């Protein structure tokens, strides 16, 4: 066969497009209806997170506080009390706060409310079941009555612990704030209401922190993702509530709706000036009362 002298053309080479490996970020929060609501869009892939992939971990807040102290988690929910011991390693995300505006952790008891609950709790004869010594609820209790005696009990067992007579009173967080009367317990003090009477400010209870070694750019990206998740949940409330119901620990839908409404609010989208002032005031008062080792420099990262 004779050659035509023509060279066969090579097919054009396909350009290889570099695909950035997804960055895996471990994000931890408590298995509660309010956290489930705010993280739903992120967990369900409803928002664009670019090359960031989130792995969700669940744990009770005291366990998360302890893990954050060890630096184990890149992003996690923590108590604002615990943040006082984390500020050198973690920054506080400006989004995802649990802030009670004239309501918060509640001190309940089998006995009816005395004329002076503060004096009764400080007399030394009563034992209060608390959900953890790093919780903000515990810090608020100690600001209210430093002499209160306490025993640490898992947060979801406190009501039963008090009903059974193992403690005289219980410090309730999460959904227990709505269910104590079902067990015949009596409200002695709402610490969020007390705090507002004292300061005129809401009570900041929990927030989300990000480890500083991730770098400024990634911390801001994470903050944007979290803010977008909260805003998406608020814009699609019915769907987010349906997801949160699975974490309601037996609460009926109306109570889940009420609880989420209490702790997923405007402060959750962003602390804002009032929320930031409340954090500073809480930590400053705790430091002056000798409940913290020293002043706390709070760094907020916003998206």
Stretches with model-predicted labels:
Residues 1-16:
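Compositionally biased, low-complexity flexible segments
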Residues 22-44, 58, 105-169, 175, ...:
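Bilobed "Venus flytrap"/periplasmic-binding protein-like clamshell domains
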Residues 25-26, 89-97:
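A structural signal for short loop-to-beta-strand junctions that line the ligand-binding cleft
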Residues 48-63:
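A short beta-strand-loop structural module common to alpha/beta enzyme folds
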Residues 60-62, 71-84, 154-155, 172-178:
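Beta->alpha turn/N-cap motifs
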Residues 100-106, 182-212, 258, 266, ...:
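Periplasmic-binding protein-like
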Residues 156-246:
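Pocket-lining segment of extracytoplasmic ligand-binding domains
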Residues 215-285:
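Secondary-structure end/capping motifs
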